[in-house]
């Protein structure tokens, strides 16, 4: 099994998979008579059908034991999905490019600094939310509508990956 290298989350590195939601380097301007800075259009909500709705939820995630064997990725073919950390804690992100099935050789891992969220583009393969803390909360913006919006792919055993935030130096 290949151990994924965990990369810092940057806009350029993550661009093939979606948007990094952060204030650094974002368009911004003052509103509310100069009392509020608006960081504008950090990501776009993508829904496939005209009757779909963008919805906001909160996910409360529990940590998984590490190192973690990555045996499954999911995708949302009908809309984008954004995760914004509410408690300021770093979290892990595992993604693979859009395609009929994810390719383990093209799968990448990132770590958010806790002030960054992500917006997965429609159809991007990703692991369900991976918190580093014992429990963490995320604001989630995604799609509600008819039709299936979650495909899961299970890797063959020889294609599985390992995510280890604390690899031993050898």
UniProtKB/Swiss-Prot annotation:
Is tRNA-binding included in the keywords of this UniProt record? no
Q: What class of enzyme is it?
A: lyase
Q: Report the pathway entry.
A: Nitrogen metabolism; (S)-allantoin degradation
Q: Which UniProt keywords apply?
A: Lyase, Purine metabolism
> What cofactor is this protein dependent on?
Ni(2+)
User: One GO molecular function term?
Assistant: ureidoglycolate hydrolase activity
Q: What is its EC number?
A: 4.3.2.3
Recorded catalytic reaction(s): these are: (S)-ureidoglycolate = urea + glyoxylate
Assembly notes: Homodimer.
Q: What function does the entry list? A: Catalyzes the catabolism of the allantoin degradation intermediate (S)-ureidoglycolate, generating urea and glyoxylate. Involved in the utilization of allantoin as nitrogen source.
Tell me which family the UniProt entry assigns to this protein.
Belongs to the ureidoglycolate lyase family.
What is the name of this protein? Answer: Ureidoglycolate lyase
Its source organism is: Pseudomonas syringae pv. tomato (strain ATCC BAA-871 / DC3000)
Annotated gene:
allA
